[in-house]
Amino acid sequence: MEMKHGNLSINSDNIFPIIKKWMYSDHDIFVRELISNACDAITKLKKLDGAGEYTLPEGYKPRIDVIVDDKEKTLKFIDNGIGMTADEVEEYITQIAFSGATEFLEKYKDKTDQDQIIGHFGLGFYSAFMVADQVNIDTLSFQEGAKPVHWECDGSTEYDMGEGDRTQTGTEITLYLNEDCHEFSNVYRVREVLEKYCSFMPVEIYLSRHAEEPETEIIDEKDLREDDQVIERIHTDAKTEEKENDKGEKETVEVSPARDEVKIRKRPELVNDIHPLWAKHPNECTEEEYKEFYRKVFLDYKEPLFWIHLNMDYPFFFFFFI
């Protein structure tokens, strides 16, 4: 694919919603928009699998990764959803405010009535320019034989697009934060925003921090997972002591067992709950889950005095806390 230089096609009929997006007092809403787009992309891929038009890879686990780089002042949003071809990038990205979700729902409306596709990809995507001087997209479509696409724009009406190097189906969006928005290169600030907008999104969202020297943690070897990056294996011999028994005889007693541990690259932090209480029957919920839900939603360290959870015919549910 040859590198292409072009101009964004602005849909004048929808320019006012775009302007309103830029006028939001809460400029952190770009996080919600980009996460919503990633959820849409994953939902679409799963629907194609359900319709028999695509077969998900064995062991497929839908996920969204948010990676903060406080040195380079970048923020990445990565999903393993449907991805895009070059033609789709042209259609859904360079033509601002065109709704790819609407077109998709029209085609699959009989199969997706019970699902939520969240809005206009083009419009939500451009909220990224509320905080970034430049935005890059690297994407690979699920379609057989598709080539990876790289797209970048510096916030003007011009963009460059060419062949990318992504090898996994899905999309990676990189924001080069402007000077006024370096707060979003802080992992704690980004976690705060994710918890504000995305605590109950239906796809697992993982937050991590990119660093030249990787952050590490030590776990028990039995807790090692396939996707863990092992740095070092650590064996600790059992500790023993000489003690006197009831007969006055000395004997060797084990005071701590041998341990096999592993130093791994720190795992990304899961920041949302994909199985919120309102999606469960009251009989499936524990007392501690209700208390934790109350603390998380109402930001109150105290415990509620009591609560009522009614789960009637879909889509009605009711929570009441005191």
Language-model region placement:
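GHKL (Bergerat-fold) ATPase N-terminal catalytic module, capturing the glycine-rich phosphate-binding loop
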Residues: 1-179, 183-184, 192, 199, ...
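GHKL/Bergerat-fold ATPase module in large chromosome/replication-associated machines
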Residues: 117, 135-158, 178-182, 188-322
